Structure formats: structure tokens, C-alpha cells
Amino acid sequence: MLKSIVGNIVSPDPTVRKLTFANFINTFGNGMFHTVGIIYFSFIVGLGAQKVALAFTIGAAVSLAVSVPAGHIADRYSPKTIGILSFIFQGLILGAQVFTKTWHIFTILLCLEYFVERFGQNARMSYIAQVGEGQKRVEARAYMRAVTNLGIGSGTLIAGIALAINTPTAYKTMIVMDALSFLLAALAYTRVPNVAPTLEKHEKFDWSVLKDHRYILATALNGGFTLHFLIQNIAIPVWVVKETNAPRWWISAIMLLNTMAIVLFQVRTSKRSKNLQTAIKQFQQASFYVAVSCLIYGASHGVNAVFASAILLAGMAIHIAGELIGSNASWMIAMDLADQRRQGVYQGIWSMGFGLSDMVGPSILVALVIGIGQLGWLILAAWFVLIGQLMRWHLRKIKSV
């Protein structure tokens, strides 16, 4: 069993192994911050939950705004160097947040962090795009995602200690540890081999990506699909508490199931994404699975605690299948559909789909699943079926490679 788990998070490829090690350090720290950050700044510092949420929204908007320029930089300069610098600056910025007392300073620092993070993420995606071709690149992304889930899950568990102690010092310790994790990740990233930029430094910024309508529409459709991540993080917790008789702790149980499934099966399922044509079919299949899970979630309303818990568990199991398959398909489409010399900017565009979904998704989901209940889940199911079919139609002329 242990050997199986290790095989799903430790790549046989030494380059991917070094990438994932740095990623684990980084996401371990992120898990700590995401658990205590909003609580610390909202209630310990006293900025208020709404104002803190607004600051995160502004930061996300900054990240979206620099996606394309950050991609241009990733194509023209060393992805390794950009990755190292981004980790260092994020660590310093996060460390400064411990001393924040006002909303304006907090927001400025958060925007700076999001700004730097976008450059680092685009550089890392550009690097992975050069690891290999086709299925090998998808497998590398799968290892990264499995380790991400393991890191965030582990960091969340450690942050639980701070929540239990519930003192300013405990919360500050978690934030400082996250800041240090960025610096350690930068150190680990120095062991990653250099890869050459795909473009020359003197080449002008090419905005033709914005005219690549096929890629832009695929990005938008994938952004619509990524709404399912917010179903897990926002819709399900609110739905369970407000509309079902399942115990609140069951939310943690099904989320733990999701985390462990990604760690154990993301790499295995990635081996099925052989080429772009296969990925297009898998994207539609994944969308269907998520649609079915929405219908199952909706059925948990109005039944006793045992049945509600069982129904939610079944819904999450189907949802996990859609998430695993859909993630692999999304990575293949994102990288193989792109101009291979401009992976940085193309992956920057692709990330904008996620960003827009994160910005508008929470309000939409709450309005649907709480505002109109089971009908809202039905609408979501129809949405995912439509997204999958539209992607299939949009890319139907692509031949297998």
C-alpha cells in the first residue's frame, strides 16, 4: 500500500521529481495559510471578514490582469530563474503581512503577492511544457497535482493546531512558517535543471494569442468546467449545513476522500490521456460525470442524516471521477492546442479561465443551490453537460496526434 502511494507522488523522472519536491514544500505552507489566514486577518487583526474577502478579490483581479504579460516574460527568460525569484519575493511579502495592521497595507501586500505568484506559476507551467510532449507532459502535471493535494492537506492538518490554540501568536507562527516555506521552495527549485527560453529576449511581445479564437473559446469552456472546484469548496459546505440533515463533520469526511483520491489516482488516470483527440472525448466524459454528481447532491435534501450522508458520499465519488479525468483532459488541451514556442503566454491565457471562474463562481453557486435549491442543482447539471458538448463540437475537427 505504501509503495503504491509513493509511486503516485514520486515520479521516476528526476526532473519531475525535483519539481514536485519544491511544489510540496510550497503547497504545505499554502495549506497552513489558507486555513488560518482569513481568520487571523478578519478577527485577530480586526479587518473584518468582508473587507478581507474584498482584498482577496482585488488580488485575484491583479493576477488576471498580468496573466498575459507574465506569460510573455516566461517565454523569453529562464523559467527556472523566474520560479526561484517568485518564491523568494512571495516569502518576503508574506512575512511582511504579519506586521499588517490596516486594510490598505494588507491589500497592497496581497496584490503584490498575487502579482509575483502569477509570474511564478506561468514560468512553472512553461517549464513543464518543455518536460516532454503529449502524455508525458500530462503525467508531469498529474504528479504536481497529486503532490499539491498532499501538501495542502498536510499543511491544513498542522494549521489545525493553531486553530485549537486560538492565540495571535499561534496564527502568526503559521503565517511565518508559510513565508519560510516559500524560501525553502526557492532553495529546492535551484536543483531543477535549466531549460532554455523558447523565444529570444529581443523578440517583440506577440499578442496574437488574443486572436487565436480557437484557444480563447476553449479557455472559456474550460473555465466553465472549473466551476466544479467551487462546488466542492463553497456549494457543498453551504448546502450540507443549510439544506441537509447530514452532520457538519461529514463535510470534512467527503473532502478528505477527495484529497486522498487525487493523491492516489491522478497519476494513474493521466496515463489514459494519450493525445489531444482522446483528451477532447475525456473532457466531455468528465463533464457528464460532474453533471451526474450535481443531481446526486441535490437528492440529499429532505432525507434523514444517514441517507443524506450516503447520498453525498456517492455524489462525491462520481464527482471525483469527473475531476480526475477532466483535469488530465484540460492539461492536454491547454498544452497541445497552444503555440509550442509560446507556452508561457498561452498557459497565462488558460489560467484566466480559472481566475474568472473563481471571481464570479461563488455568487452564482450560492444563488443556485441556496436560492432555488434542487432546481439549482438541476441547472448546474445541465450546465456541465452543455460545457462538455460544446468543447467536443468546438474542437471536433482536430485529428489525433
Which residues are covered by each model-predicted region?
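Helix-to-loop junctions at the C-terminal end of transmembrane segments
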Residues: 65-78, 163, 264-281
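C-terminal membrane-cytosol helix-exit motif in multi-pass small-molecule transporters
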Residues: 160, 180-198, 390-394
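Transmembrane alpha-helix termini and helix-breaking/packing motifs in multi-pass membrane transporters
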Residues: 43, 154-172, 360-377
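Cytoplasmic helix-loop-helix junction between adjacent transmembrane helices
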Residues: 109-148
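C-terminal transmembrane helical hairpin of 12-TM major facilitator-type secondary transporters
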Residues: 280-326
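Structural signature of the two symmetry-related core transmembrane helices
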Residues: 81-95, 179, 281-297
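Conserved MFS/SLC helix-loop-helix module at the cytosolic interface between two early adjacent transmembrane helices
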Residues: 64-101
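Helix-loop boundary and gating motifs at the non-cytosolic
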Residues: 6-61, 214-258
